[in-house]
Amino acid sequence: MSKQILLIALFYLFAVPEIFAQVSEYRGQTSTGAYYKIEVPQAWLPEDGLVIWNHGYQGYTQTSPDSNPSLGPLADVALEQGYAIAASSFSQTGWAVFNSHIDNQQLFEKFVELVGMPDKVFIQGGSMGGIVSLRDIESGLIPNVEGALLFCGAVAGAQNWYNAFDLRMIYEAVCEDVSGAGLPTQSWYEQPSLVRGELDFLDSLERCTGLITSEQVGGVLGALLRSSDQNERLNRILDITQIDISFLLLNLGYAVFELPSLVNHPKKLNGLLPFDNAAVDYGDADINLRVKRNAALPSSRQLLLENYSPSGNIGDTKIVSIHTSRDDLVSVGNQRLLRDLIPASQLSIAIAVEEEPSHCGFSYDEGLSAWNSLRSWVDGGAQPNAQDIQNTCKKNNSDTGQCRFDFSFELPSSALIFPRNFSAPTLGTNSYDSATNTISIEALKQAGEPGSYNLELVPSLQNDSVFNLEDIEFIVDVGSWQHQALFLPDQQMLYLPSLKILPWAKNDPKYNVFMYYTNESGQETLKLLEFETTND
């Protein structure tokens, strides 16, 4: 399984023509631990410029940076056009955005040391390399970035990981009653073992959905090999998550293997758990009741989003961003956020409308036309739109199937299938009485258990930031899901949404409050961890 995930998740390669220009190559390692590769055409001058390539995601089985980083799918073309080209392996694998801007700063400094200062810089990036490229531009650590070409970029940033988290939650809810169909780990943040975990993962998919055998056989016969129950569960997962069957194995693999790697890496999230769904409506009444609910500390969510969420502060850089229309790994909805953030005069988006889903399944001429359109724009030509890029592509290839950019394509509203709303209405009222220092909680749900509780938290005599539990009352579930107070036993954390401080008036703020539960010598107490203001 891991081999398939890696092969698909790595960025696609274009077939490029051979060139015969002589180049000088430099390879080495910077102080961050990242490897670099630089190629420079003979007689290169500063005015010829530099292209920096940012590669895509590398899976959890690749634990060390690549000592011979790729220069990208258009490297030969760029060299033939006179550009020098450089790439970093990055000092981290996986979601490498935590330190990639520093890695690329050192790459650029190494280029200046070995070759000279370029008058202009272009950045190209694919898949994860798209958000890496935006961080490069917004950090300002590389000067003179005049243009950027992004292929199927994860440009909405870290929030893309919520789709992986939601897929796992939905999969587990659909498959929970299927014997032997449990995923390799009980908790979404636990890292499965390399071999046993992969076998258990494939076995889970086969038992629940029949996907593995049916995909191996393929076609109508493959579909017939699935039982009616497997078909029903498979279609339900696909309908709710809105992904194509061809992406289910890959995307669920990211959720089960790559997401825990991100969470547990000591130089990334270091065990912090930023993923939540306490307020998420999955659009299916039964799934809403079955799905495991989780809350996340605001500081944990913030650390994830800081690595990285684009701001739109790109200076004078011009960007051409292309995407395939049916990409369900990095959804085309990523382009919506880019469009909302960046001035229209600096951004051209073109979507290749495809018959079969793919991640970055561009033709060579589509990539080349986007690149040459960007170069012309940077050199003083008119800003290209999708139709211009399509026309450029068709000039180079009479096969119209190799040029699929559609000016009329409408972008989805979001990169997220299930957007987060931390101010969603709640079942029950949570309040803090400032006169008595008492917290009253209504409809507290213990994750994974039936029923809810009404209770009060009374401050300890020794420490008014520590609370004891009193007046606990069990109440039967209402039969439908609503956003409510939540206790997470595995994290020993209590989540209190939309808490009011009494006396409370209509325009007063509400707070999402997070507390830590302890039971020492039979004394149950809660300590305040964090809080955030809601916007309702």
Task: Pin down the residues of each PLM region.
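Short beta-strand/loop motif that positions the catalytic acidic residue
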Residues: 320-323
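Primarily recognizes the serine-hydrolase "nucleophile elbow" in alpha/beta-hydrolase
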Residues: 120-176
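Conserved alpha/beta-hydrolase "acid-adjacent" motif
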Residues: 329-333
